[in-house]
Amino acid sequence: MKKTLREIAEYLGGTVSGDGEVLIGGLATLDDAGEGTLTFLANPKYAAKVATTKASAVLMGTGGNTHGKNAIFHPNPYLAFAKLLTLFYTAPAKPVGVLPGAFVADGVKLGADVSVYPGASIGAGAVIGDRVVLHPGVVLYPGVVVGNDVTLHANVSVRERCRIGNRVTIHDGTVIGSDGFGYAPDGASYYKIPQIGIVIIEDDVEIGSNCVIDRAALEATRIRRGTKIDNLVQIAHNVVIGEDCIIVSQVGISGSTQLGNHVTLGGQVGVAGHIKIGDNVMIGAKSGVAGNVEPNQVLSGIPVMPHRDWLRSAGIAPKLPEMKKTLSALEKRVAELEAKLAKGE
């Protein structure tokens, strides 16, 4: 598929600079672009590459330096490029129906245009919406409810009675609804607390590969609308994550913690249990959150503190060995002076 630069600009709501009739047949990065491709500039640190890229045109922020290249100006070039990927990329065709080798138990309700690949298994009483795709190895336990336009990639498991909303994508190897980590000490060992709740994944959520979201002990672990979860994330039982949150890889969230809306947790953040994090909070990578966090803050560190304070503390840390030597020398000198004063010298 080829489109003129002007057609692409009209599709995006952008403005053409240069030859609007140049044909674009693909998309590429600044470094790898060639003739007939469109590239994009979203991060100013790469602005110098616009002068050297071999792309036929560049998508960039309004008023950017084109270095004489054909361009589309757009107020949000990153978002615009994402939309172009959808326009230029054609997803592989998928078969419709239950393919040989898939297992569908009695009492399952399948919506229209469902694709169930070989090796997928759907338990009794499950309800599957329209245009759902279940890739090989997907296992839906009895009583699972899946909304419309959902894609579950290979080897995703959704345990009994859990509920998946509309337009949800879950990537390979993720487990939804495994038992929460709950044990009661009995004096000699530990008694397993039955985890009889569920997990609810609301609409427009995307979950990466090899994540685990544990079922609640009694009610529901809930991931609210629009949240995006990276790979290798652990979410414990009874956690509630608000709308439009970003949870980056290797985050661990302990049981019964609640996140507000628009919360961002950087990679490897650890969050203690039974706490609340307010709306619009950003937590830097590798931080430890041990207590409640008020809304509208940017925090980092272990334990978390205002991000600017953490940067100052981190800058001091490499100097601590030398500072210790200096402090020891000062302490020794003060002790010598005090001894002289005591002798009346």
UniProtKB/Swiss-Prot annotation:
Q: Subunit structure, briefly?
A: Homotrimer.
Q: Known InterPro entries for this protein?
A: Hexapep (IPR001451), Hexapep_transf_CS (IPR018357), LpxD (IPR007691), Trimer_LpxA-like_sf (IPR011004), UDP_GlcNAc_AcTrfase_non-rep (IPR020573)
UniProt-listed CDD domains:
LbH_LpxD
Name under which the protein is recorded? UDP-3-O-acylglucosamine N-acyltransferase
Q: Gene behind this chain? A: lpxD
The UniProt record lists the EC number as 2.3.1.191
The family classification in the record reads: Belongs to the transferase hexapeptide repeat family. LpxD subfamily.
Q: Which top EC class is given? A: transferase
Domain of life of the source? Bacteria
Q: Where is the active site?
A: H237
Q: What organism is this sequence from?
A: Geobacter sp. (strain M21)
Record key words, sorted: Acyltransferase, Lipid A biosynthesis, Lipid biosynthesis, Lipid metabolism, Repeat, Transferase
GO CC field: membrane
